Amino acid sequence: MDQFKGEPRLPKFAVPKRYDLRLNPDLIACTFTGTVAIDLDIVADTRFIVLNAADLSVNDASVSFTPPSSSKALAAPKVVLFEEDEILVLEFGEILPHGVGVLKLGFNGVLNDKMKGFYRSTYEHNGEKKNMAVTQFEPADARRCFPCWDEPACKATFKITLEVPTDLVALSNMPIMEEKVNGNLKIVSYQESPIMSTYLVAIVVGLFDYVEDHTSDGIKVRVYCQVGKADQGKFALHVGAKTLDLFKEYFAVPYPLPKMDMIAIPDFAAGAMENYGLVTYRETALLYDEQHSAASNKQRVATVVAHELAHQWFGNLVTMEWWTHLWLNEGFATWVSYLATDSLFPEWKIWTQFLDESTEGLRLDGLEESHPIEVEVNHAAEIDEIFDAISYRKGASVIRMLQSYLGAEVFQKSLAAYIKNHAYSNAKTEDLWAALEAGSGEPVNKLMSSWTKQKGYPVVSAKIKDGKLELEQSRFLSSGSPGEGQWIVPVTLCCGSYEKRKNFLLESKSGAYDLKELLGCSIADGSDKINGTCSWIKINVDQAGFYRVKYDDSLAAGLRNATESQSLTSIDRYGILDDSFALTMARQQSLASLLTLCSAYKKELDYTVLSNLIAISYKVVKIGADANQELMSGIKHFFIGVFQFAAGKLGWDPKQGESHLDAMLRGEVLTALAVFGHDETLKEAVRRFDAFLADRNTPLLPPDIRRAAYVAVMQRANKSDKSGYESLLRVYRETDLSQEKTRILGSLASCPDPTIVQDVLNFVLSDEVRNQDALYGLSGVSWEGREVAWKWLQEKWEYIGNTWGSGFLITRFISAVVSPFASFEKAKEVEEFFATRSKPSMARTLKQSIERVHINANWVESIKKEDNLTQLVAQLSSN
């Protein structure tokens, strides 16, 4: 039997065709029992059947296999569960005959509190605490609910039957076929599913209300939520029904199931899960309260619903063959969710906001410790770690880059062909490339392999010499060290206006292009500067390519002027800023030049551009403080000046008929001013917060600016005056809206007093905060609170490991607490602490976090060497 241990995949001698699964969850004892009968095709000589199982007790006496066309069931004399490998090995006394037989097993397990497998979530109903039973099987946890072939390529049909209390709602992937009441229990059986992977099977049992609608072709769509919250499901319902219609057209394949249920689960580890026909969500990703949710909450609901519904085609109908190709699922669903959201809400300018996805991808992929989009996965424990910004955000960004290169129409037609060819089966990355190649006639596989099979991305350096534009590519690393790698880079450039545009591929390390031939631009003889109508050259127009651009001084100056005069699109203004920030962090350009560029954004009012500038300002202020404490107040003062214009235009109160984007921007700008200690902002925020304490429905504190007010209150809290902090905790305890709770949690640790930060972190681990939400409390730890947070992490590590250690959330604890540091000593301390405590599922995150500390430390050293920085900051502030 030992020959089956230590293997990444199950042996191929038996293939499941159909599961008949019966489950009986006990929501009071938090246990479940079950039986499964599996139609199993024996395709090779074997005495063994090997399948996945974990955290289950299998009743040995219940195990039997009935060969094809036989009525005699064979018992399995040996039944062994290898816990570490999560496999169940059944050994029979004889070689099993080929063909489809039936394997039967009985088992029982515990409804765990780890938010994976078959688990329990708690909620209150009429003041009483109750349990619901929920499944979360992706990536490899169906095996914790029933023994199965728990790999995405082992697709089968599922016939599910549940035995549950009569007063509860019981949902699964398919519609109910019949219900039989038996005393205070009911037996609910569901229609048999189409062929699908185990990770998409879903069951939810609890008390729920729902709202209902239909798609244009009559498919029933419902949103389920806790009793009394049905109204909060209406927005998601509208988006869901419209999105299913939209994808039916886009993919040229109808939605394959008879119904779509979307349900809000109070305890949920991820944002949402695309189970076929029964999508589960965190409450914050599905529910929208007209009065107390912010515009950003509304947008989050729309994009998450669109993402999960895209998976019904891309992931569920066509499934990746193995987790190496996870990015096909996630990168694609991320990209196409923007397409759907843009179609439903064009005024949100969501494709400009897509840049935030690209930036997150570029940020992670700039690390030595990144990984390729297509990544080897050899153990179930490694899968969790690749649900990261590479699979989702870099994945989505390279799809956007390819669509931009091939054209939208060709891209769409090729995708429809791909889905048609692989429906109800599995695909690898090469299959997608083959479909796009057939549809476009372009060498897509050759073009894209450099982007998916090697990690990292290039920085393209641009300079003008003797009338030629010289481009050179090299791998970009945030550490500033030279990297290996070469890409086929789709270059787009404009000169002086968007009318003059050129696209070409940079296939070698470098190239020189005659500007007159390329764009009709004239360059003064012997000059290396552009002039006349060509006052600027922008490379990577619309940021369509997944790479960075480094301009020489004269090109950079031209772009800075074009930014200030708003001659560039918001997407290009964003790109110039983001590249400049990344190059500064990598010490390829000075902090002085980054700050000079930032001053060109003083009149900026675009939401996406300004919110990125705000994110950059937080980082620069903290790193400046690490380099030189005196510098910190100067840089804060400078950024307050940069944000004043937008703050003045937007004010505190929503204006009649203002845009969704202005509503989101107001909150971000006011939060930044509060964080930087702007006196007027702090006073006004506290005044409005006091009005809110007196009346939760006051118009003085609409949801879009609440976070700003909460952060302002925490800036003033300290150990001798905790009143503001205590008031916020009171609001937290009184609200039952998850979005309000997470908004408060995300503000508490921004307090500059380390004693309060310590209190906040202990509160985060209390029973008052759901395990899924603890990370919000860590997200905004102040510069002054870093050390306290690190000590706390070490002291509480055993508890944190026991509570979150089996899922991906534990990696977020490490990155949130470790990454903000900026000293080599701290990196060493972290390494020493984790030397005996790391596990395979957190190894990559730990290395990435330590690498970020090294990057910060090197950056601090280089800032210390910059001359006249304090004078420059003062000068920029006074302009």
From Swiss-Prot:
The active site is at E308 (proton acceptor). The record marks Y392 as: Transition state stabilizer. Disruption phenotype: Loss-of-function mutants show irregular, uncoordinated cell divisions throughout embryogenesis, affecting the shape and number of cotyledons and the hypophysis, and is seedling lethal at 5 days after germination due to root growth arrest. Quiescent center and cell cycle markers show no signals in apm1-1 knockdown mutants, and the ground tissue specifiers SHORTROOT and SCARECROW are misexpressed or mislocalized. apm1 mutants have multiple, fused cotyledons and hypocotyls with enlarged epidermal cells with cell adhesion defects. apm1 alleles show defects in gravitropism and auxin transport. Changing H307A: Abolishes function. It catalyses: Release of an N-terminal amino acid, Xaa-|-Yaa- from a peptide, amide or arylamide. Xaa is preferably Ala, but may be most amino acids including Pro (slow action). When a terminal hydrophobic residue is followed by a prolyl residue, the two may be released as an intact Xaa-Pro dipeptide. Zn(2+) binds at H307, H311, E330. It holds the Pfam family ERAP1_C. Binds 1 zinc ion per subunit. Ubiquitous with preferential expression in 5 days-old seedlings, roots, young flowers, upper inflorescence stems, and rosette leaves. One of its GO terms (cellular component) is endoplasmic reticulum. Its EC number is 3.4.11.2. The keyword Hydrolase applies. It is a peripheral membrane protein. GO terms for biological process: auxin polar transport; proteolysis. Belongs to the peptidase M1 family. Metallopeptidase that binds to the auxin transport inhibitor N-1-naphthylphthalamic acid (NPA). Required for embryonic and seedling development as well as cell cycle progression. Homodimerization is required to proper localization and activity. May play a negative role in the regulation of PIN auxin transport proteins. Dileucine motif seems to be involved in protein-protein interactions. Homodimer. Interacts with N-1-naphthylphthalamic acid (NPA). This is Aminopeptidase M1. It comes from Arabidopsis thaliana. The gene is APM1.
